């Protein structure tokens, strides 16, 4: 199986456990690894025979911007479900980063990775 990697998808969203996160929002970043059979697209040179990665970016950004989940696990699941829902993918890995997580004395970020198949 082939893979399509889309990295560095950023959007401002309102998912978070604390009220301030859902009110003020924060930046999220997503990396996708999409398992897809690219043989037909490689032969046909037709965008309809693959997953348009611009569409994948738009799906992720829309979910980040419009969702107000408490848990990043829920947001990652929604992203995986939407990518698998295109019908063109067999499996997807979603690496969802909460940039600047609100943790005292912590200046890093937190990344959650999930792997889902249909």
From Swiss-Prot:
Keywords: Folate biosynthesis, Lyase. Pfam families: FolB (PF02152). GO terms for cellular component: cytoplasm. Its EC number is 4.1.2.25. It is an enzyme of class 4 (lyase). GO terms for biological process: folic acid biosynthetic process; tetrahydrofolate biosynthetic process. GO terms for molecular function: dihydroneopterin aldolase activity. Pathway: Cofactor biosynthesis; tetrahydrofolate biosynthesis; 2-amino-4-hydroxy-6-hydroxymethyl-7,8-dihydropteridine diphosphate from 7,8-dihydroneopterin triphosphate: step 3/4. The active site is at residue 98. The keyword Lyase applies. Substrate binds at residues 21, 53, 72-73. It catalyses: 7,8-dihydroneopterin = 6-hydroxymethyl-7,8-dihydropterin + glycolaldehyde. The keyword Lyase applies. InterPro entries: Dihydroneopterin_aldolase, FolB_dom, GTP-CH-I_C/QueF. Catalyzes the conversion of 7,8-dihydroneopterin to 6-hydroxymethyl-7,8-dihydropterin. PANTHER family: DIHYDRONEOPTERIN ALDOLASE 1-RELATED (PTHR42844:SF1). Belongs to the DHNA family. This is Probable dihydroneopterin aldolase.
């Amino acid at each position: 199986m082939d893979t399509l990697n889309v990295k560095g998808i950023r959007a401002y969203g309102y998912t978070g456990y604390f009220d301030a996160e859902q009110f003020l929002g924060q930046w999220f970043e997503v990396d996708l690894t999409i398992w897809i059979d690219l043989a037909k697209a490689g032969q046909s040179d037709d965008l309809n025979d693959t997953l348009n990665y611009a569409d994948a970016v738009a799906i992720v950004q829309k979910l980040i911007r419009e969702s107000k989940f408490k848990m990043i696990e829920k947001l990652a699941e929604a992203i995986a479900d939407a990518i698998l829902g295109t019908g063109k993918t067999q499996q997807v890995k979603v690496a969802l980063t909460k940039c600047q997580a609100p943790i005292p004395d912590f200046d890093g970020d937190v990344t959650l990775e999930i792997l889902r198949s249909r």
